Regions:
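Conserved short loop/turn motifs at secondary-structure junctions
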Residues: 1-3, 132-137
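Charged, low-complexity surface patches
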Residues: 3, 62, 140
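Amphipathic alpha-helical
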Residues: 5-7
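Glycine-rich, acidic loop regions that bind phosphate or pyrophosphate groups
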Residues: 9-16, 20-128, 134-136
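Glycine- and acidic-residue-enriched helix-capping/strand-helix junction motifs
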Residues: 138-145
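Single conserved hydrophobic/aromatic residue that forms the stacking wall/gate
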Residues: 148-157
């Protein structure tokens, strides 16, 4: 297992050195716009997740998809009692989390400040929003990611 930035660097290396674009390591086609670096980079770092004061999980079960990340989330929860919110019920993550609706409209409502957790995100100093692979499988993935990028400039610094 490797992070997306390393995978992308390897892909770029092979394309430039041996002129090969015949690379595929995913079992399913996922929407990943590699023109936007933040689409494939885990910005906070795995260690950085321990600084988060609010974590929102979208389309992911880190207990099975990213066990090291999940252990860092758990460590942060146990130490700081942070709030963790998941769009959809993903089962036992080994720490408590609030479940909210699992649909694209919910994401839009959060960004448009029409959802109850919008205010929590605004008040948070170090929020982390973690997208999982299941979001990238959706036909609406480009739309969902565009919503996030549209909202970035309005995020207070």
């Amino acid at each position: 297992m490797t992070n997306m930035e390393t995978t992308y660097a390897a892909k770029d290396f092979f394309e430039k050195t041996i002129k090969s674009e015949n690379l595929e390591s995913r079992y399913e086609k996922l929407y990943i716009n590699t023109n936007v670096r933040s689409n494939y980079l885990f910005n906070s770092s795995i260690e950085g997740i321990e600084k988060s004061d609010l974590i929102i999980l979208i389309g992911t079960n880190p207990r099975f998809e990213a066990t090291i990340l999940n252990s860092r989330i758990r460590k942060n929860y146990l130490k700081n009692k942070i709030e963790i919110i998941s769009l959809g019920d993903v089962g036992d993550l080994t720490y408590p989390y609030q479940v909210i609706s699992n649909n694209t409209d919910t994401i839009k409502d959060i960004i448009d400040n029409k959802h109850e957790i919008s205010e929590k995100i605004k008040k948070s100093k170090y929020p982390s929003i973690i997208f999982g692979q299941s979001v990238l499988k959706l036909k609406s993935a480009p739309y969902i990611l565009s919503l996030i990028h549209i909202s970035e400039p309005t995020r207070p610094s």
